[in-house]
Amino acid sequence: MKEPIQKYFQVGTIQWMTHPPVSYPVCDSVRTICCDPYFGALEITHIPDSEARERVKKMLDQSHLWVCYGAQPNLLGKGLNPNHLEETERRKAEEELTRAVDEAAYMGPGVSLFWQENGNLIPGNRHIPSF
């Protein structure tokens, strides 16, 4: 193949996997990815610090990247399952997913939302409309 892979694919990375927050400040890692022409897509997840979240939002607004929001860390980290047999447990997962949708919507109108359950990616994505 003589052409760059970007001719055929939109190469992306999962920010919180390739740049774990324990080792890399979230704003620094997002800036690095935004400035790298190799990437055309980026998956982010919950950013607990509101100041950092605002800085990341501004960077993503100015970037060339297609952005996805991964809700799986929000669920898996707390042991939540939207298909749990107990209604109270399903409600907890639903509340967490609702918070994830709200944060994804805040991060920008073009952000897509993904979540993963039991190791299987749920087909498709949920496009977050602009509010």
Model-derived features: where do they sit?
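Glycine-/proline-rich flexible loop or hinge segments
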Residues: P37-L42, G77-E86
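Short glycine-enriched loops at secondary-structure junctions
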Residues: W16-P20, Y69-N74, E117-N118
